[in-house]
Amino acid sequence: MKSEQQSAFLIGVVGVCASGKSTLIRGLESRGYRARHIAQEHSYVKDMWKRITNPDVLIFLDASYPVTVKRRQLNWLEADWAEQQRRLSHAREHADLAIQTDQRNADEVLAEVIQFIGEFLAKGQSNTTPQA
């Protein structure tokens, strides 16, 4: 059941292509959370994640180059993946939670995020994403 606090709370999700962002967001939304994909991996503006969405909490999902290629059959070079990592560096530094998804399935990632959000909300924190 969705609580008032939960529905007012905004979760931003960033990460490299094929790291599991869309899957995580669907899982969060199905449980009553507001979550937004922030396409930071495609932006040259290092703090776009903050300017566009300014989430209450920022989740960073990472995946290695070989795993991203396997998951989505992406037609890209390791240099493209490295460029996304570079573009995401500011968001990674400011993330409230960072998860390496190579060895985790979608349910494990979702469970970790929900546990983190529960603890975060229990502490009464909001709008605590560090300032740039």
Where do the model's predicted regions map?
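Conserved substrate/cofactor phosphate-moiety recognition/catalytic segment
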Residues: 3-6, 16, 26-56
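Walker A (P-loop) ATP-phosphate-binding motif of ABC ATPase nucleotide-binding domains
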Residues: 10
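Hydrophobic anchor at the beta1->P-loop junction of P-loop NTPases
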Residues: 13
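Conserved glycine(s) of the Walker
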Residues: 20
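Conserved Walker
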Residues: 23
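Conserved phosphate-donor/acceptor-positioning beta-strand/loop module used by diverse small-molecule
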Residues: 54-71, 99
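Small-molecule kinase domains that catalyze NTP-dependent phosphoryl transfer to phosphate-bearing small molecules
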Residues: 74-112, 123-132
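Catalytic phosphate/metal-binding cores of nucleic-acid and nucleotide-processing enzymes, i.e., regions
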Residues: 118
